């Protein structure tokens, strides 16, 4: 049996992979803040559901996108995810390992922190014209 917070995060990852913004939006607090480390064009703090959905939509501009969850650890208020994402933009291909910490309250996501392993490589990759 998995922790209910892991179930919620896995549901969100599935919705992200299928582009289901309705499911994603329904699981986010209206005052969510999503922190993305680094210097790539999508880095920074994204406040509110519309801004978070726009941030997540940046990955729509990749081909052959995949997301592999390595492990998840959960408590009653947080889920920590170790994962690897890869994709292609034009002729450029990139694989990014990252840690994500998701904070939950009352069954919705209130805050997220992304920590990318290769921030410089991600910045170069996300700057490739599409």
Predicted regions and their residues:
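A beta-strand edge to alpha-helix "cap/lid" segment located at domain peripheries
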Residues: 1, 53-130
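Short, low-complexity N-terminal intrinsically disordered segments enriched in polar/charged residues
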Residues: 1-30, 128-130
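Residues at secondary-structure transition points
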Residues: 3, 43-47, 93
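A short, structure-level motif marking secondary-structure boundaries and short turns
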Residues: 5-6, 41, 84
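Hydrophobic pocket/interface hotspot
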Residues: 9-12, 23-28, 32, 48, ...
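Short, flexible active-site loop motifs that bind/organize anionic cofactors or intermediates
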Residues: 11-14, 42, 62, 112
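A solvent-exposed, acidic/Ser-Thr-rich amphipathic alpha-helical stretch
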Residues: 22-23, 29-77
């Amino acid at each position: 049996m998995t922790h209910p917070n892991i179930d919620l995060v896995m549901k969100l990852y599935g919705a992200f992979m299928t582009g289901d913004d309705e499911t994603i939006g329904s699981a986010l607090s209206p005052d969510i803040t999503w922190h993305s480390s680094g210097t790539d064009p999508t880095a920074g703090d994204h406040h509110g559901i519309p801004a978070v959905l726009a941030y997540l939509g940046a990955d729509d501009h990749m081909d052959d996108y995949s997301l592999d969850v390595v492990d998840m650890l959960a408590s009653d208020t947080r889920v920590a995810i170790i994962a690897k994402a890869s994709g292609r933009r034009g002729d450029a291909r990139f694989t990014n390992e990252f840690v994500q910490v998701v904070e939950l309250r009352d069954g919705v996501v209130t805050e997220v922190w992304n920590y990318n392993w290769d921030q410089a490589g991600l910045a170069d990759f996300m700057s490739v014209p599409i």
